[in-house]
């Protein structure tokens, strides 16, 4: 999980979601693309 000031989708499988007030990116194809804003 990468923590970044700005999260962007890295590939076509990345989805931007909101969990507990935090913006996150989850990726079904590549788990390395997981990101959290903060």
Swiss-Prot record:
- Family stated for the protein in its record: Belongs to the bacterial ribosomal protein bL36 family.
Q: Which UniProt keywords apply?
A: Ribonucleoprotein, Ribosomal protein
User: What Pfam families would the database entry show?
Assistant: Ribosomal_L36
Question: SUPFAM superfamilies this protein is in?
Answer: Ribosomal protein L36 (SSF57840)
The protein's name is Large ribosomal subunit protein bL36
Name the residues that span the membrane: none
What InterPro entries has UniProt attached to this entry? Answer: Ribosomal_bL36 (IPR000473), Ribosomal_bL36_sp (IPR035977)
| Annotated Gene Ontology cellular component terms | cytoplasm; ribonucleoprotein complex; ribosome
- PROSITE patterns xrefs: RIBOSOMAL_L36 (PS00828)
Q: Which organism is it from?
A: Lactobacillus johnsonii (strain CNCM I-12250 / La1 / NCC 533)
What NCBIfam families would the database entry show? rpmJ_bact
Q: Does the keyword Translocase apply?
A: no
- Give one GO biological process term: translation
Q: Which gene encodes it?
A: rpmJ
Name the PANTHER family for this protein. 50S RIBOSOMAL PROTEIN L36, CHLOROPLASTIC, LARGE RIBOSOMAL SUBUNIT PROTEIN BL36C
Keyword Ribonucleoprotein present in the record's keywords: the answer is yes
Query: Mind telling me which HAMAP family this protein's record contains?
Result: Ribosomal_bL36 (MF_00251)
Q: Name one GO molecular function term.
A: structural constituent of ribosome
């Amino acid at each position: 999980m990468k923590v970044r000031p700005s999260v962007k989708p890295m590939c076509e499988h990345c989805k931007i979601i909101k969990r507990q007030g935090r913006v996150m990116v989850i990726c079904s194809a590549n788990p390395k693309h997981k990101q959290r804003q903060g």
